[in-house]
């Protein structure tokens, strides 16, 4: 994954060579149009890479092998890069937020899906289906709820299993369900190492851990659903689509408010809080975002890049094409030059802090290692990211004030606002 980081860094430098004229007047409606263009491009890339993931998984299932499983894993990792850059569109856009749970829900109680180690346990006070293991069982019966799972299909996953019994941790679809099926559980705790699922879990001739036929069906179904869901979101951003229509209905001020809501909520409540600070407080690897693959460092990095994309009005496609146009950054420099300079400094500090985390991961010190108890160096690296994101959010709030925007609600997190309730 270091290749992708280096590619993106190079693209950011290249983008600087085509920096727009910041002295030219900027039409706020054109800024919103650029925001839409980037949504179309980044969700389009998410769909392209999901289709490549599907093709890789289909090849693996046709001829299971260790090499085939590794290729599928690499395709999954590549698919995460454009998708994570879309997450700044989640908050403030209700169409995206309501849809997002189908593709990126976490954390998940993986025992709903497949076999787990003894250390996982068999019961949860909050989830009757904590260890239901649908791959091994054609009928699920718990807490008065019965599910006929004789046929594993996209419909079963989407309509019956996902968030079964109203429990959010019953994640049956999306990137993280596929991640678990490719890697298996990460049993290394806060030590180096990720999931070690054998390729033979998908072999019909040399099946390990039983039910390989149903496991194959589940993996294929989950991947089909991911592609279908991303196709839906791509259409949502076309003219006349639900996300596009909702955004346009908000008007100019509402559109700008949506952009800043997405940036601030991702930076503060979601990324700094729920995805980073919470895991650090609990020293719990179960709180890391891509916990089976240990790809969390990259997911966090590209979330931060997504925030920058929205502000700078530019996005580098997987093809290498640069999508850009009139930007929020240009608008801010016109209205409040000092705040604009401050925001650029905040973005640079966040990128620097994130890059340090990625560098540690390349040495085997992935996010779950960094948040381990008594890892003072790891804590310092992660805390610097949290601090940078919090400062970034404070500057976003200044931008909101300078642009005289209203109805901007930046989401918080107990891990930042009320940490005492975590314990």
Where would I find each of the regions flagged by the language model?
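Sec-dependent signal peptide recognition
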Residues: 2-7
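C-terminal motif of bacterial Sec signal peptides marking the signal peptidase cleavage site
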Residues: 12-15
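Bacterial signal peptide processing site
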Residues: 17-20
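Mature extracytoplasmic or organellar-lumen-exposed domains after removal of signal/transit peptides
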Residues: 22-423
